[in-house]
Amino acid sequence: MYFDISTLDSRSSYKLLTATVVPRPIAWVVSADDQGRLNAAPFSFFNCFGGHPPVICVGVGNRGGGPKDTLANVQARREFVVNLVPEALAAAMNDTATDFPQGHDELQITGLATEPSRHVSVPRIAASPVALECTLKEVITIDHNANIVVAEVVAVHVADEAVKDAERCHIDTAKLQLIGRMQSPGGYTRTRDAFSMRQLDFDEWQATRGNSR
């Protein structure tokens, strides 16, 4: 089936993309305003876009003609923390997606404890198995409703039980039990069903695959 995006309204194009670009990791962003009040919100338009320097991007929309709390906080303080979401915290994460009035502390409302970060002033969610301390590089505004937050990761926290070899940065990803976003509304997936494939160099590929062509 062919879809011409130019003929679709914004809701239809959103549904089409979020139902097909899956699974998407979830950035559970903790930020703070200029008075130190905390905000927590999940975003699934998120991924890492470089390892050196380590860069992540988060897509944040606007609300009511202005920036969402997360975007306003990030632009004001130029720092935030991305927490990744395990299945055990899925319900709490979903609660923080509620459209609370401005100034409400979602962490306090949901009873989520925090721990201090090392390099940024914004705390991390204590129960999250992975937290990325981030500093803002730039915000790219696209049209009137889309913003891409580009940030550098300055520190990473990983739950001890998921670290196989700290010196080599080997992580047992399965032990993180992370979830991902699927289609809207309300679609999620677990990361338990995984498989591995070793990447071949050209000589190996030629020997095992090329001769069959």
Where in this protein do the model-derived segments appear?
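Basic, polyanion-binding surface patches
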Residues: 1-213
